Amino acid sequence: MSQCIDGFKHVCSSFFRCFDIDIYKQSGGLGDPELLARETVFSVSEIEALYELFKKISSAVIDDGLINKEEFQLALFKTNKKESLFADRVFDLFDTKHNGILGFEEFARALSVFHPNAPIEDKIDFSFQLYDLKQQGFIERQEVKQMVVATLAESGMNLSDEIIESIIDKTFEEADTKHDGRIDKEEWRTLVLRHPSLLKNMTLQYLKDITTTFPSFVFHSQVEDT
Protein backbone atom coordinates (compact mmCIF):
# COMPACT_ATOMS: atom_id res chain seq x y z
CA MET A 1 0.00 0.00 0.00
CA SER A 2 2.69 2.50 0.99
CA GLN A 3 4.58 1.90 -2.26
CA CYS A 4 1.48 2.61 -4.34
CA ILE A 5 0.60 5.73 -2.38
CA ASP A 6 4.22 6.81 -2.88
CA GLY A 7 3.66 6.26 -6.58
CA PHE A 8 0.58 8.47 -6.52
CA LYS A 9 2.51 11.10 -4.57
CA HIS A 10 5.18 11.04 -7.27
CA VAL A 11 2.59 11.51 -10.01
CA CYS A 12 0.95 14.39 -8.12
CA SER A 13 4.35 15.89 -7.47
CA SER A 14 5.15 15.76 -11.18
CA PHE A 15 1.74 17.26 -11.91
CA PHE A 16 2.25 20.30 -9.73
CA ARG A 17 5.96 20.62 -10.43
CA CYS A 18 5.04 22.20 -13.76
CA PHE A 19 4.21 25.25 -11.65
CA ASP A 20 7.49 25.13 -9.80
CA ILE A 21 9.55 26.67 -12.61
CA ASP A 22 10.52 30.32 -12.86
CA ILE A 23 6.84 31.32 -12.37
CA TYR A 24 6.59 34.58 -11.47
CA LYS A 25 -4.19 44.63 -19.85
CA GLN A 26 -7.11 43.19 -18.89
CA SER A 27 -9.29 46.32 -19.38
CA GLY A 28 -8.26 48.63 -16.61
CA GLY A 29 -4.77 47.13 -16.34
CA LEU A 30 -3.52 46.89 -12.80
CA GLY A 31 -6.79 48.14 -11.38
CA ASP A 32 -6.89 48.54 -7.61
CA PRO A 33 -3.85 46.76 -6.11
CA GLU A 34 -5.03 47.48 -2.57
CA LEU A 35 -8.34 45.72 -3.25
CA LEU A 36 -6.58 42.73 -4.78
CA ALA A 37 -4.21 42.60 -1.83
CA ARG A 38 -7.17 42.50 0.55
CA GLU A 39 -8.80 39.70 -1.40
CA THR A 40 -5.67 37.56 -1.86
CA VAL A 41 -2.66 36.70 0.28
CA PHE A 42 -0.40 39.02 -1.72
CA SER A 43 0.78 42.36 -0.41
CA VAL A 44 0.29 45.52 -2.47
CA SER A 45 3.94 45.47 -3.55
CA GLU A 46 3.65 41.81 -4.54
CA ILE A 47 0.55 42.61 -6.62
CA GLU A 48 2.49 45.34 -8.41
CA ALA A 49 5.38 42.94 -9.10
CA LEU A 50 2.95 40.32 -10.39
CA TYR A 51 1.52 42.88 -12.77
CA GLU A 52 4.94 43.45 -14.32
CA LEU A 53 5.20 39.70 -14.88
CA PHE A 54 1.67 39.61 -16.29
CA LYS A 55 2.50 42.32 -18.83
CA LYS A 56 5.53 40.35 -20.01
CA ILE A 57 3.58 37.14 -20.50
CA SER A 58 0.54 38.81 -22.07
CA SER A 59 2.68 40.36 -24.80
CA ALA A 60 4.56 37.18 -25.70
CA VAL A 61 2.36 36.34 -28.71
CA ILE A 62 -0.26 39.09 -29.00
CA ASP A 63 0.41 42.36 -27.23
CA ASP A 64 -3.16 42.89 -26.06
CA GLY A 65 -2.80 43.00 -22.29
CA LEU A 66 -4.45 39.59 -21.88
CA ILE A 67 -3.02 36.09 -21.57
CA ASN A 68 -4.41 33.65 -24.11
CA LYS A 69 -3.99 29.89 -23.95
CA GLU A 70 -0.97 29.87 -26.27
CA GLU A 71 0.86 32.46 -24.15
CA PHE A 72 -0.12 30.58 -21.00
CA GLN A 73 1.23 27.30 -22.36
CA LEU A 74 4.44 28.91 -23.57
CA ALA A 75 5.02 30.49 -20.18
CA LEU A 76 3.96 27.63 -17.95
CA PHE A 77 4.71 24.52 -19.98
CA LYS A 78 7.29 25.69 -22.52
CA THR A 79 5.08 24.45 -25.35
CA ASN A 80 2.29 25.78 -27.52
CA LYS A 81 1.05 22.44 -28.81
CA LYS A 82 -2.68 22.45 -29.36
CA GLU A 83 -3.56 19.19 -27.60
CA SER A 84 -2.68 19.08 -23.91
CA LEU A 85 -5.26 17.93 -21.38
CA PHE A 86 -3.00 19.00 -18.53
CA ALA A 87 -2.42 22.52 -19.84
CA ASP A 88 -6.07 22.90 -20.79
CA ARG A 89 -7.22 21.90 -17.30
CA VAL A 90 -4.88 24.30 -15.52
CA PHE A 91 -5.82 27.14 -17.88
CA ASP A 92 -9.53 26.46 -17.35
CA LEU A 93 -9.12 26.78 -13.58
CA PHE A 94 -7.27 30.07 -13.97
CA ASP A 95 -9.92 31.27 -16.46
CA THR A 96 -12.72 31.86 -13.96
CA LYS A 97 -14.69 34.00 -16.45
CA HIS A 98 -14.63 31.15 -18.98
CA ASN A 99 -13.89 33.44 -21.91
CA GLY A 100 -10.66 31.86 -23.13
CA ILE A 101 -8.37 34.63 -21.87
CA LEU A 102 -6.85 35.64 -18.55
CA GLY A 103 -7.07 39.13 -17.18
CA PHE A 104 -4.74 40.29 -14.46
CA GLU A 105 -7.21 39.73 -11.62
CA GLU A 106 -7.77 36.11 -12.66
CA PHE A 107 -4.02 35.63 -12.93
CA ALA A 108 -3.31 37.08 -9.49
CA ARG A 109 -6.17 35.29 -7.74
CA ALA A 110 -5.18 31.92 -9.18
CA LEU A 111 -1.51 32.33 -8.24
CA SER A 112 -2.59 33.38 -4.76
CA VAL A 113 -3.49 29.74 -4.07
CA PHE A 114 0.19 28.85 -4.52
CA HIS A 115 1.49 31.48 -2.10
CA PRO A 116 3.14 30.05 1.05
CA ASN A 117 0.61 31.93 3.17
CA ALA A 118 -2.45 30.64 1.30
CA PRO A 119 -4.84 28.59 3.47
CA ILE A 120 -4.37 24.83 3.18
CA GLU A 121 -8.07 24.45 2.40
CA ASP A 122 -7.63 26.60 -0.72
CA LYS A 123 -4.80 24.36 -1.89
CA ILE A 124 -6.86 21.24 -1.25
CA ASP A 125 -9.81 22.69 -3.16
CA PHE A 126 -7.70 23.71 -6.17
CA SER A 127 -5.98 20.33 -6.39
CA PHE A 128 -9.36 18.59 -6.15
CA GLN A 129 -10.73 20.66 -9.03
CA LEU A 130 -7.77 19.70 -11.20
CA TYR A 131 -8.81 16.06 -11.05
CA ASP A 132 -12.57 16.66 -11.15
CA LEU A 133 -12.56 16.93 -14.94
CA LYS A 134 -16.33 16.61 -15.33
CA GLN A 135 -16.94 19.12 -12.54
CA GLN A 136 -19.36 16.76 -10.80
CA GLY A 137 -18.08 17.33 -7.28
CA PHE A 138 -16.26 14.01 -7.14
CA ILE A 139 -13.34 12.30 -8.85
CA GLU A 140 -13.91 9.13 -10.84
CA ARG A 141 -11.33 6.48 -11.57
CA GLN A 142 -11.19 7.38 -15.27
CA GLU A 143 -10.54 11.03 -14.42
CA VAL A 144 -7.58 10.07 -12.25
CA LYS A 145 -6.23 7.87 -15.03
CA GLN A 146 -6.64 10.63 -17.63
CA MET A 147 -4.76 13.13 -15.51
CA VAL A 148 -2.05 10.65 -14.52
CA VAL A 149 -1.45 9.74 -18.17
CA ALA A 150 -1.45 13.42 -19.17
CA THR A 151 0.95 14.31 -16.38
CA LEU A 152 3.33 11.52 -17.31
CA ALA A 153 3.25 12.65 -20.93
CA GLU A 154 4.04 16.26 -19.96
CA SER A 155 6.92 15.20 -17.72
CA GLY A 156 8.35 12.70 -20.21
CA MET A 157 7.95 9.82 -17.75
CA ASN A 158 7.04 6.32 -18.87
CA LEU A 159 5.14 3.89 -16.65
CA SER A 160 3.51 0.70 -17.85
CA ASP A 161 -0.27 0.42 -17.88
CA GLU A 162 0.04 -2.23 -15.19
CA ILE A 163 1.89 0.13 -12.85
CA ILE A 164 -0.55 2.98 -13.54
CA GLU A 165 -3.53 0.73 -12.83
CA SER A 166 -1.89 -0.51 -9.63
CA ILE A 167 -1.28 3.05 -8.43
CA ILE A 168 -4.90 3.99 -9.11
CA ASP A 169 -6.21 0.78 -7.49
CA LYS A 170 -4.33 1.38 -4.26
CA THR A 171 -5.15 5.09 -4.22
CA PHE A 172 -8.86 4.36 -4.45
CA GLU A 173 -8.50 1.58 -1.90
CA GLU A 174 -7.25 4.12 0.62
CA ALA A 175 -9.15 7.24 -0.44
CA ASP A 176 -12.57 5.83 -1.34
CA THR A 177 -13.72 5.17 2.21
CA LYS A 178 -17.39 5.17 1.16
CA HIS A 179 -16.69 2.41 -1.36
CA ASP A 180 -18.78 4.04 -4.06
CA GLY A 181 -16.11 4.03 -6.75
CA ARG A 182 -15.33 7.73 -6.55
CA ILE A 183 -13.48 10.23 -4.38
CA ASP A 184 -15.50 13.13 -3.05
CA LYS A 185 -14.01 16.35 -1.71
CA GLU A 186 -13.99 15.20 1.91
CA GLU A 187 -12.29 11.93 0.99
CA TRP A 188 -9.74 13.88 -1.05
CA ARG A 189 -9.16 16.20 1.89
CA THR A 190 -8.58 13.25 4.21
CA LEU A 191 -6.15 11.68 1.75
CA VAL A 192 -3.99 14.77 1.26
CA LEU A 193 -3.95 15.61 4.96
CA ARG A 194 -2.74 12.08 5.60
CA HIS A 195 -0.13 12.46 2.86
CA PRO A 196 0.85 16.18 2.87
CA SER A 197 3.49 15.64 0.19
CA LEU A 198 0.62 15.40 -2.31
CA LEU A 199 0.30 19.17 -1.94
CA LYS A 200 3.95 20.14 -1.61
CA ASN A 201 4.07 21.63 -5.10
CA MET A 202 0.94 23.65 -4.44
CA THR A 203 3.26 26.06 -2.63
CA LEU A 204 5.69 28.27 -4.54
CA GLN A 205 8.09 29.78 -2.03
CA TYR A 206 9.40 32.46 -4.37
CA LEU A 207 5.94 34.06 -4.67
CA LYS A 208 6.62 35.35 -1.18
CA ASP A 209 9.76 37.05 -2.48
CA ILE A 210 8.47 38.20 -5.85
CA THR A 211 9.20 41.85 -5.15
CA THR A 212 12.91 41.09 -4.90
CA THR A 213 13.15 38.33 -7.50
CA PHE A 214 11.25 40.01 -10.34
CA PRO A 215 12.29 41.02 -12.97
CA SER A 216 15.37 38.83 -12.70
CA PHE A 217 13.25 35.79 -13.51
CA VAL A 218 10.56 35.01 -16.04
CA PHE A 219 8.63 31.85 -16.89
CA HIS A 220 10.75 30.63 -19.78
CA SER A 221 13.06 32.04 -22.40
CA GLN A 222 10.20 32.17 -24.91
CA VAL A 223 8.87 35.18 -23.03
CA GLU A 224 11.40 37.66 -24.29
CA ASP A 225 12.45 40.82 -22.51
CA THR A 226 11.30 43.89 -24.41
Curated annotation (Swiss-Prot):
Subunit structure: Homodimer. Part of a K(+)-channel calcium-sensing kinase/phosphatase complex composed by a calcium sensor CBL (CBL1, CBL2, CBL3 or CBL9), a kinase CIPK (CIPK6, CIPK16 or CIPK23), a phosphatase PP2C (AIP1) and a K(+)-channel (AKT1). Interacts with PP2CA, CIPK1, CIPK2, CIPK3, CIPK4, CIPK6, CIPK7, CIPK11, CIPK12, CIPK13, CIPK14, CIPK16, CIPK23, and MTN1.
Sequence ranges assigned to domain EF-hand in this UniProt record: 36-81, 82-117, 119-154, 163-198
Biological role: Acts as a calcium sensor. CBL proteins interact with CIPK serine-threonine protein kinases. Binds calcium ions. Binding of a CBL protein to the regulatory NAF domain of a CIPK protein lead to the activation of the kinase in a calcium-dependent manner. Mediates the activation of AKT1 by CIPK proteins (CIPK6, CIPK16, and CIPK23) in response to low potassium conditions and in the context of stomatal movement. Negatively regulates the enzyme activity of MTN1 in the presence of calcium.
Protein name: Calcineurin B-like protein 3
Lineage: Eukaryota, Viridiplantae, Streptophyta, Embryophyta, Tracheophyta
Subcellular localization(s) per the UniProt record: Vacuole membrane
Disruption phenotype: No visible phenotype when grown under normal conditions; due to partial redundancy with CLB2. Tolerant to low-K(+) stress. Clb2 and cbl3 double mutants show stunted growth, reduced fertility and necrotic lesions at leaf tips. They also have a reduced vacuolar H(+)-ATPase activity, are hypersensitive to excessive metal ions and are more tolerant to low-K(+) conditions.
Site (Involved in dimerization): S155
Keywords, ordered alphabetically: Lipoprotein, Membrane, Phosphoprotein, Repeat, Vacuole
GO CC aspect terms: cytosol; membrane; plant-type vacuole; plant-type vacuole membrane; plasma membrane
A molecular function GO annotation: kinase binding
GO biological process, one term: potassium ion homeostasis
Membrane topology, from the record: Lipid-anchor
One Pfam family, short name: EF-hand_5
Family to which this protein belongs: Belongs to the calcineurin regulatory subunit family.
Keyword set includes Oxidoreductase: no
Record note on modification: S-acylated by PAT10.
Primary localization class, coarse: membrane
PANTHER family recorded: CALCINEURIN B (PTHR23056), CALCINEURIN B-LIKE PROTEIN 3-RELATED (PTHR23056:SF116)
InterPro entries, per the entry: CNBL1-10 (IPR045198), EF-hand-dom_pair (IPR011992), EF_hand_dom (IPR002048)
Residues with the Phosphoserine modification: S216
